[in-house]
Amino acid sequence: MKLDYNSREIFFGNEALIVADMTKGSNGKPEFTNHKIVTGLVSVGSMEDQAETNSYPADDVPDHGVKKGATLLQGEMVFIQTDQALKEDILGQQRTENGLGWSPTGNWKTKCVQYLIKGRKRDKVTGEFVDGYRVVVYPHLTPTAEATKESETDSVDGVDPIQWTLAVQATDSDIYSNGGKKVPAIEYEIWGEQAKDFAKKMESGLFIMQPDTVLAGAITLVAPVIPNVTTATKGNNDGTIVVPATLKDSKGGTIKVTSVIKDAHGKVATNGQLAPGVYIVTFSADGYEDVTAGVSVTDHS
C-alpha cells in the first residue's frame, strides 16, 4: 500500500542532565541561575500522572461531567555516580568539615531539570538520516526521598557497579508556562541545523530550553505580500483586503494560519470594515514564529 507516513524517528540514550534555579524575571518570564550539569545519569523512569480523573453521571449519561485532579508526575532517576551537583543541589545534603563526606538533611531542593535524549530520523522526502535531540524539561521537580542503592560482594562472576535510585515528583510551575498555561513537563524535538545550533549554544554555556527559545536553522513562515486596496465606496469604512488562510514555510510546506488585522495604533480591525489607512496583518501557526505583512487602504475616488 502507498501510505503517507511521517518521517521515522527513534530516540536512545540520556545525556546532559542540567539543574538550575528558576525565578520570575521583571518581564514575567523565567530567569535561570546556578546552572549545573549532573554526571552519571543512567535512566529516567516513567513519570506517571498521579491525578485522578472522575466522571459524574446524570440522567442517562455516565460522564455528565468529567474532572481531573491537579497534575502530579511521579517517577525516578537512576545514577551510576553521585557527585556534588546531585548531593548538594538536588538532595540538599550537608558536606562534612573535612570535605570528604555528605549527610542527608531532608531539605530536598526544588529545581528546574532538563535532560537530553539523542534521536535519529529518516527524512520522508530525501531518505537521509538526520540527528537530533528530544529535550525534556521538568520546570518544578523535587526529590521525595533520599537516593537508595544496593551493593553486593565481589565474586568470581564479577560485580555490577552500584546504581543510586532517586524518587522524584514534578508539578506545575507558576513561572514556566506554554501559551499561558502552567505545565509540569515539556518535551521539545530539535533536528538537523537546529540541533547543531542547540549543541553549540549548550557547549558555550549551559541553558534551559523555553517555548520561545529561537535556534538557528528553524523552519519559518514566509510572510505574504498583500495587495493594497481602496474602499468600496467613497467616504465609508468598507475596505476589504485579501488575507490568505495558508502560507508557505521556508521548506515549501503549506501551513494553515490564523491572522489578526491591526491599524496603525495597534487596535484590532475587522476586514470588510477597514477605514483608509495603514494596517499590519499578523499571521500565526503552531510551531512557528509569527510573521507580519503591511497593507494600505485608500479612499475610493
From Swiss-Prot:
Main location: virion
Keyword hit for Transmembrane: no
Localization terms from the record: Virion
GO CC aspect terms: virus tail, tube
Keyword presence, Iron-sulfur: no
Domain of life: Viruses
InterPro entries per record: L_lac_phage_MSP, L_lac_phage_MSP_N, Phage_tube_C
BP GO annotations: symbiont genome ejection through host cell envelope, long flexible tail mechanism
Disulfide bonds: none
Function: Forms the cylindrical rigid tail tube with a 4 nm wide central channel for DNA ejection. The tube is composed of 31 hexameric rings.
Family membership: Belongs to the skunalikevirus tail tube protein family.
Subunit structure: Homohexamer. Interacts with the tail terminator protein.
Protein name (database record): Tail tube protein
Phylogenetic placement of the source organism: Viruses, Duplodnaviria, Heunggongvirae, Uroviricota, Caudoviricetes
